UniProtKB/Swiss-Prot annotation:
Keywords annotated in UniProt: Cytoplasm, Isopeptide bond, Metal-binding, Phosphoprotein, Translation regulation, Ubl conjugation
Protein name: Protein pelota homolog
Residues with PTM Phosphoserine: 374, 380-382
GO terms classed as biological process: nonfunctional rRNA decay; nuclear-transcribed mRNA catabolic process, no-go decay; nuclear-transcribed mRNA catabolic process, non-stop decay; regulation of translation; rescue of stalled ribosome; ribosome disassembly; RNA surveillance
Length: 385
């Protein structure tokens, strides 16, 4: 998705102009457009014309309309999005208040205006427009003194950082200058990895180099991670895959991607993270039921106690027709993040999202039990008996 323009005021009213560039962007757009918004886009309209002789004919014209959105229809198989509404801006072909359906098209821009842009919608735009959020694969291509940190998306390879440090040669009887420079180089590469790689999106980080550079670098990185208790690196250690490359230049990445080990590793999908989160919830429900709850009221009460470690929520809840209900979910997400909890927004198009929908679409894994919640559970089960 390409962001052309963003005009949002301090009161969160405003508009954004976007260009969907691939099928997945239609899914993002479906989650952005809500009833009551105004949508401006190019569309085809059938127009009746009358000739000088009085005969009536019709032809199709391309025009730009601004609709007040009344209905949204998304075809997940064809990735087509149709938006129905009434015309709210003067147009030579369409009367004010007349109904029309716009079919949003790839590579054709649209402008979406809202009275209130909430944090969940703004974050979705940020993720849809930042290639880092669609990059399943990251790569560190390196040699002594030179490293490129790259992100590999379905359509391109992006260089996010280049690290260059002059490494003096080893001298007989004195390697200290060489070793200090090498350590400084490794440290800068580690910092670049942490700055540019989203581990909740990336499923594999290739570390490619000639010789033993990759092994020595990975040893250094994880030793430092243990010393500093760097949980992000330690928890994602299994995602790092060491492969051969002839140099630290970007063009050597192609060799690494052709490695058969890499190909088999990349067969996983982004949905794997959602599957694991839901699996963790079910395990907690089975083994420590006082730390796993679902349903909006229960989850809100757990949040009031600042007990939520991980919030699992379906994206379909943010498409709720009632603005007050939708705002309630947004406030919950914001609050969990403020209390240092993790928020996982599940796609209702994935199997795990469908399973979560069967559990009301919202669930939480707690840091610690909340006695009042457990008591409520017991009360409700005794009432059922």
């Amino acid at each position: 998705m390409k962001l052309v323009r963003k005009d949002i005021e301090k009161d969160n009213a405003g508009q954004v102009t976007l260009v969907p560039e691939e099928p997945e962007d239609m899914w993002h757009t479906y989650n952005l457009v809500q009833v009551g918004d105004s949508l401006r886009a190019s569309t085809i309209r059938k127009v009746q014309t009358e000739s000088s002789t009085g005969s009536v004919g019709s032809n199709r014209v391309r025009t730009t309309l601004t609709l007040c959105v009344e209905a949204i229809d998304f075809d997940s198989q064809a990735c087509q999005l149709r938006v129905k509404g009434t015309n709210i801006q003067e147009n030579e072909y369409v009367k004010m208040g007349a109904y029309h359906t716009i079919e949003l098209e790839p590579n054709r821009q649209f402008t979406l205006a809202k009275k209130q842009w909430d944090s969940v919608v703004l974050e979705r735009i940020e993720q849809a427009c930042d290639p880092a959020w669609s990059a399943d694969v990251a790569a560190v291509v390196m040699q002594e003194g030179l490293a490129h940190i790259c992100l590999v998306t379905p359509s391109m390879t992006l260089t996010r950082a280049k690290v260059e440090v002059n490494i003096p040669r080893k001298r007989k009887g004195n390697c200290s200058q060489h070793d200090r420079a090498l350590e400084r180089f490794y440290e800068q590469v580690v910092q670049a990895i942490q700055r540019h790689i989203h581990f909740d999106v990336v499923k594999c980080v290739l570390v490619a180099s000639p010789g033993f550079v990759r092994e020595q670098f990975c040893d250094y990185m994880f030793q430092q991670a243990v010393k500093t208790d760097n949980k992000v690196l330690l928890e994602n250690r299994s995602k790092f895959l060491q492969v051969h490359a002839s140099s630290g230049h970007k063009y050597s990445l192609k060799e690494a991607l052709c490695d058969p080990t890499v190909a088999s590793r990349l067969s996983d999908t982004k949905a794997a993270g959602e599957v694991k989160a839901l699996d963790d919830f079910y395990k907690m429900l089975q083994h420590e039921p006082d730390r796993a709850f679902y349903g909006l009221k229960q989850v809100e009460k757990a949040n009031e106690a600042m007990a939520i470690d991980t919030l699992l929520i379906s994206d379909e809840l943010f498409r709720h027709q009632d603005v007050a209900t939708r705002s309630r979910y947004v406030r919950l997400v914001d609050s969990v993040k403020e209390n240092a909890g993790t928020v996982r927004i599940f796609s209702s198009l994935h199997v795990s999202g469908e399973q979560l929908s069967q559990l009301t679409g919202i669930a939480a894994i707690l840091r610690f039990p909340v006695p009042e919640l457990s008591d409520q559970e017991n009360d409700s089960s005794s009432e059922e008996d």
